[in-house]
């Protein structure tokens, strides 16, 4: 089932408990307010707070006693399905008390309870009510069994615990066995005798008459209440010790009846803890250790009885199975088993007081059948059966590490001798045979102790093929079967040994000189002949073991396949060393590096492959000598020497990243090629204005017409002087005869290039011209403030200022040129830049004239935008303050009078502004 299916009831109970706790808390809060109101009323009537409180409580208890039975029926019929453990507010389920005279009721009797006594129910109710007013929502956790005692101011043994409000609300963390049934004093319930573990705490004789009056009823009611599906319980108990004991008595029964109210299994048995832990964590300060242990140990016994089961008799269990690796991993246990026939492992059964001796069925077990598990072929061994029959007791086998260490020592002894090349083949064979014969010396030790022989048999290692290969005597073959069983474990490393043996024999044979491959194969086979497993298997008298042992050594023909190295013709067929002559052929070129490259393939790599072949064994030494005689390093030296002797190329010249400005295109000094459209005959007009062609329209010009008659022939001449847009001057003479305009001829009689591009003044000249004309132009413009100049156009102000202000001594405005342009600015969104990259010749000064072309100024600080020039506009500079210019202009917003304004050229975002410096009249020439 899913987690939700298992715990949905718990979550539902928690939700209900939370809602109920909120309701009870709200009720308790209302009660507290009502109580405060009663206290204030008592103060008005002159009744002290304590007396008013007691009177109100006593009156409330009286009504509570009369109405408890009705509410108890409602309680018994309700089933919320949860046990919240709430201890606040349930006893106040009755209606609000009415205003009554507190003095009309007698005061309750005052009595000081002695040590270990429980106060009467009435006093406990008062203390309980006081505590409930202070603790509206207290859902106790596991330690609520001691924290639920009511406040009793006159009983120091059971003081109130005001620290409980710090615990958070835990509606479903409390187990069902902690539920506190609401107490109804007048409910008719028969007393029930206490069960075992439910005896109350002894009290003095003074309360012997009062204590039993409600304790049986409480016990009976609680048991009945718990069996009624545990309705929601939110009332805090009005009793202290007996309530706890009664909850203990119903704890086991409650666990069996309602496991659904146990969301936390790990915390459902808190009473099974040791009394010491409970004393340290949950003991109230009024209890002493003895009483608390008595009240907690007994519930522990009652709680543990249905949970714990009696331990079964260990003798009823079958003996533990024998693990196949028992002898290897646990030598001490296997030894005890061999001596007594019983494994020492199940000693844990003795913890329960039962005998550790197992059933006698294991004593008659045949050790030969059990065998040692690792190698199945060696389970049955004749020698082991003889040893078991003679001694009838299994000896503890030695540690496998010792055997492996012995075998490794033997391996080191056998492999260390053939490593140096023997003087002769016979000597090497004899040395190996003598070493192999020396191996069995330590082996007879297991014979003296037959038990050790059987023990070694228990963890048989893999076979060791080293002594089998190197031994030629019968003594090694007659070794004990224990070693024969150990050898199969080391079966695999023999391939490496055989390979090492071949290498050693090859090295020994290579020392002799030239040998035939047949001799090598015969010697190799002679050395491999001692590996005869049949001789080793002879000492084993059993029938199954030799058949099982023989197949493994029979796999050894694989080393016999080793004659593959005898296929020496392959290196013979390898004409690759013969190709070495190519290196000699490569000596033909004078360049020595090529032989070096040729010698590299002649390195020992080829000789190593041939090193296994006997006839070519001398070649590596020769190659090595040749390499020593002709070292490759001196060969590349000529290259380095040649490179050193050759003069290095000169360093490249340093790069110069400074780029000179591109030269301006050559200015055509000659007249421009204009289309005069002579075919139209515009020049033949003698009466009225002439209609100039397109290239000449809009230009300033003057013209003259003349004719000459010679008899019947009449020659006509038209002279026209033009000022071009760049202030250049050109003159044309057009002639034709009679009235035939088709034969008209044109001739350029005069051309004066533009002064802007051909007469560039210096800074001193510019400053001098400003001093000469600037003040006149500016002052004349200032005098015209508020007046209309000329036709009221902006251009008229600049023209008249130059013409009239300077007395015809300055160059008068022509087209949109008012002198020499000293600065040209172009605006964009990224800022202001100079047109064509031309830096200004001088700063703007007083008397200079500005010409605007479709300009837009945006003041980012003020947020204003102004358009100047649509498409052109002209103004006169009166003052330059650095960041702005004060100018005089006309025809602003169709207001055709002169005004003074300010402008900032840094705010230019679109258009072009050109500043002109007044120049002399002869600067531009005359038509």
Swiss-Prot record:
Residues 223-232, 290-303, 383-395, 469-478, 618-629 have a biased composition (Polar residues). It is a peripheral membrane protein. GO terms for cellular component: membrane raft. The keyword Oxidoreductase does not apply. Residues 22-33, 67-93, 123-193, 206-222, 233-275, 401-417, 424-440, 503-517 have a biased composition (Low complexity). It comes from the Eukaryota. It comes from Debaryomyces hansenii (strain ATCC 36239 / CBS 767 / BCRC 21394 / JCM 1990 / NBRC 0083 / IGC 2968). The keyword Translocase does not apply. This is Altered inheritance of mitochondria protein 3.
């Amino acid at each position: 089932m899913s987690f939700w299916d298992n715990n949905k009831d718990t979550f539902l109970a928690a939700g209900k408990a939370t809602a109920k706790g909120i309701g009870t808390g709200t009720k308790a809060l209302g009660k507290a307010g009502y109580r405060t109101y009663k206290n204030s009323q008592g103060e008005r009537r002159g009744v002290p707070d304590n007396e008013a409180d007691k009177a109100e409580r006593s009156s409330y208890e009286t009504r509570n006693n009369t109405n408890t039975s009705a509410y108890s029926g409602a309680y018994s019929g309700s089933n919320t399905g949860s046990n919240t453990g709430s201890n606040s507010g349930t006893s106040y389920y009755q209606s609000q008390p009415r205003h009554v005279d507190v003095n009309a009721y007698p005061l309750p009797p005052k009595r000081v309870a002695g040590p270990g006594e429980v106060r009467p129910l009435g006093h406990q109710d008062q203390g309980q009510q006081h505590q409930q007013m202070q603790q509206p929502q207290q859902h106790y956790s596991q330690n609520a069994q001691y924290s639920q005692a009511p406040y009793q101011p006159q009983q120091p043994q059971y003081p109130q615990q005001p620290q409980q409000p710090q615990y958070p609300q835990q509606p479903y963390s409390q187990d069902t066995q902690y539920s506190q049934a609401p107490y109804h004093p007048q409910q008719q319930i028969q007393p029930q005798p206490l069960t075992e573990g439910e005896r109350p705490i002894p009290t003095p004789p003074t309360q012997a008459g009062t204590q039993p009056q409600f304790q049986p009823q409480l016990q009976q009611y609680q048991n009945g209440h718990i069996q009624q599906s545990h309705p929601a319980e939110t009332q805090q108990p009005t009793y202290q010790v007996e309530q706890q004991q009664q909850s203990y008595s119903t704890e086991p029964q409650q666990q069996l009846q309602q496991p659904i109210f146990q969301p936390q299994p790990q915390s459902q048995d808190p009473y099974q803890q040791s009394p010491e832990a409970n004393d340290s964590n949950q003991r109230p300060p009024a209890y002493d250790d003895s009483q608390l242990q008595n009240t907690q140990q007994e519930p522990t016994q009652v709680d543990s009885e249905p949970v714990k089961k009696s331990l079964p008799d260990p003798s009823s269990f079958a003996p533990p199975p024998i693990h196949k690796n028992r002898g290897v991993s646990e030598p001490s246990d296997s030894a005890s088993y061999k001596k007594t026939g019983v494994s020492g492992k199940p000693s844990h059964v003795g913890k329960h007081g039962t005998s550790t001796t197992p059933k006698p069925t294991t004593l008659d077990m045949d050790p030969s059948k059990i065998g040692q598990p690792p190698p199945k072929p060696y389970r049955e061994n004749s020698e082991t059966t003889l040893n078991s029959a003679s001694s009838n007791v299994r000896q503890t086998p030695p540690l496998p590490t010792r055997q492996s260490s012995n075998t490794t020592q033997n391996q080191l002894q056998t492999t260390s001798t053939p490593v140096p090349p023997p003087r002769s083949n016979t000597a090497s064979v004899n040395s190996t045979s003598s070493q192999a014969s020396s191996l069995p010396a330590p082996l007879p030790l297991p014979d003296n102790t037959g038990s050790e022989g059987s023990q070694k048999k228990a963890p048989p290692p893999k076979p060791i093929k080293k002594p089998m290969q190197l031994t030629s005597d019968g003594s090694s073959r007659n070794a004990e079967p224990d070693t024969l069983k150990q050898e199969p474990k080391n079966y695999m490393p023999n391939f490496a040994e055989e390979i090492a043996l071949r290498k050693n024999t090859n090295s020994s044979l290579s020392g002799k000189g030239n040998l035939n491959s047949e001799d090598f194969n015969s010697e190799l086979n002679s050395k491999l002949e001692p590996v005869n497993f049949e001789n080793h298997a002879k000492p084993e008298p059993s029938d199954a073991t030799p058949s099982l042992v023989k197949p493994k050594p029979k796999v050894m023909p694989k080393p016999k396949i080793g004659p593959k190295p005898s296929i020496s013709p392959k290196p013979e067929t390898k004409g690759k060393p013969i190709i070495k002559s190519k290196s000699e052929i490569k000596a033909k070129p004078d360049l020595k590096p090529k032989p070096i490259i040729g010698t590299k393939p002649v390195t020992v790599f080829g000789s190593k492959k041939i090193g296994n072949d006997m006839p070519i064994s001398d070649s590596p030494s020769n190659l090595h000598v040749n390499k020593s005689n002709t070292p490759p390093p001196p060969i590349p030296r000529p290259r380095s020497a040649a490179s050193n002797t050759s003069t290095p190329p000169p360093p490249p010249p340093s790069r110069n990243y400074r780029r000179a400005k591109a030269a301006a295109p050559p200015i055509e000094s000659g007249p421009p090629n204009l289309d005069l459209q002579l075919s139209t005959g515009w020049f033949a007009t003698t009466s009225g204005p002439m209609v100039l062609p397109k290239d000449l329209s809009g230009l300033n010009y003057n013209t003259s017409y003349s004719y000459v008659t010679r008899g019947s022939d009449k020659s006509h001449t038209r002279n026209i002087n033009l000022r071009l847009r760049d202030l250049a001057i050109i003159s044309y003479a057009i002639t034709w005869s009679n009235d035939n305009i088709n034969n008209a001829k044109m001739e350029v009689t005069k051309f004066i290039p533009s002064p802007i591009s051909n007469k560039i003044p210096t800074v001193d000249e510019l400053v001098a011209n400003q001093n000469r004309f600037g003040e006149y132009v500016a002052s004349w413009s200032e005098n015209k403030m508020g007046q209309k100049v000329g036709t009221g156009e902006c251009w008229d102000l600049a023209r008249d200022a130059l013409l009239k202000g300077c007395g015809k001594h300055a160059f008068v405005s022509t087209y949109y040129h008012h002198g020499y342009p000293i600065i040209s600015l172009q605006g964009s969104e990224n800022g202001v830049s100079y047109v064509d990259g031309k830096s200004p010749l001088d700063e703007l000064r007083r008397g200079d004239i500005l010409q605007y072309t479709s300009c837009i100024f945006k003041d980012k600080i003020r947020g204003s935008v102004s358009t100047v020039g649509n498409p052109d506009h002209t103004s006169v500079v009166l003052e330059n303050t650095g960041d702005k210019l004060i100018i005089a202009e006309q025809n602003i917003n169709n207001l055709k009078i002169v005004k003074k304004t300010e402008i900032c050229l840094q705010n230019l975002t679109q258009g072009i502004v050109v500043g002109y410096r007044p120049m002399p009249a002869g600067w531009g020439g005359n038509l």
